[in-house]
Amino acid sequence: MNNIYDTANQLAKEIQQSEEYMTYKIAKEAINLNFELKNKIEEFEKARYDAQIVALQTGKDDEAKMRHVQELYGELIQNQEASKYFDAEMKFNILIADINKIIGEAVQSLLK
């Protein structure tokens, strides 16, 4: 039987070689070269995070914060680089979520 750490290291390498990882990495590097766009994305991510925190703490969405997030996103996706970045980020996050789900299901009975 393989050492579980060897398997985990192999999984990490395969993630780094995946299309989702590579596409996200390239998109992120392109964003980092554009100072103005990078700042806009950071502003959007902070606004989205703040809106999520409020929703978690209060149990409801703050309409003004959500509207601000939507406005920022609407502006950003008009930019081709930003649109590619968000698409790549979403696909990478789906990959990681799927892997986490597989691992979670493997240990679920132990955690009950």
Report each predicted region and the residues it spans.
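Terminal, compositionally biased segments used for targeting/anchoring and flexible tails
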Residues: 1-112
